[in-house]
Amino acid sequence: MKLPQIINSLLETDMYKFSMGQTIFHRFTSYKTTWTFKCRNKDVHFTDEMVEEIKEQVQAFCQLRFTEEELEYLDNITWIKGTYVDFLRLWQPRYEEFTITTDAPCGLAIDAAGTWLNTTMYEIPVLAIVNEVYFRMAYDYDVLLKQFKRRLDEKVRLLEEDTYRLSDFSEFGLRRRLSAEAQEMAVKAIAEVELPADSHFIGTSNVYLAKKFNLKPVGTMAHEWIMCTGQGNHKHNPAYSNWYALDAWVKEYGILNGIALTDTITTDCFLRDFQLTYATLFSGVRHDSGDPYEWGDKMIAHYNSLGINPRTKTLLFSDSLDFERATALYDYFKDKAKVAFGIGTFISNDTDEEALNIVMKTTKCNGMDVAKISDVAGKGMCKNPDYVDYLNRCIDYRMKNDK
């Protein structure tokens, strides 16, 4: 490797990989998934040298194991069970499950295929590797880091001056961070700020940094959870994906770990399944696409229609936020519901250069295509347009006929 090792701990992933991973381990061990990388930036190109470095970094990641100290940390999290910790004691990433080539318009193609239990753990470290390799090799990294520090100092100053009202907010920037160094710098700096009354820094999705700085590791479920539990079983009608996902989650966690993601197959379809039982059991819902104000008003109206006081529930916003957008959302919703924010790239990769818009998504489960139909065009990723059409027709039929 030409660069220092980027991923140095198996805790260096997002918290929801463990919350989903435990449920996969207990309920879906036979499921197999395929994951596909995509760079959405049109003007980005990965050189052959970058691709080779990415391969070597992924190989280094695959040599890691959980330490006993890390396992003890996980075991002390309320909802993590000893059986899952014992599995993690034996678990290791498998480089054999990766295919990394230059066969893509951006110059980088990555696929991972294997059990869902394994491959779910690859997404976040791989994206962090790709991002850091790109910015270290395409730019003068020292210049970028100076820009990052300057902007971070300004954020800290404005936080201290009570410029923003961020309610309960967390850092969600691991997958698109400038570097491990930059993310750690940002999390540490924000954690040390004496925030005013309307802002509370809760923690980070990066479990490694949460452990290091004694912060709360934050995260529940991702789109893959709804896609695979709902669409990975060929006997399921995919328009009911949310029901299967919520049902399995509640069986695993009861009232714990309860922020539901709404936009995997549109929020309107989600609400058909998010009825009194689930709306009561889950502590809140997460917004990740579409107009956040329309979404929040829709969720509040839904809670009211069920006789649930929305002020007892959390609206967690996590779509392309910065501190100004979060403040505006807080001001609008603060008297209507609990409000929380997950803020990623703005904290972990804010420089003078455009951040990468990269994803690694589940494209198959158990040999069957899976897809996300979010609340805004352009966020979906499926290799088979016929399946997307089928899924849309299933959703449309349900919305028209399942009253």
Segments and roles (model prediction):
Residues 1-241, 359-403:
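Ordered alpha/beta subdomains of enzyme catalytic regions
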Residues 2-3, 213-403:
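Glycine-rich phosphate/ribose-binding loops and adjacent secondary-structure elements
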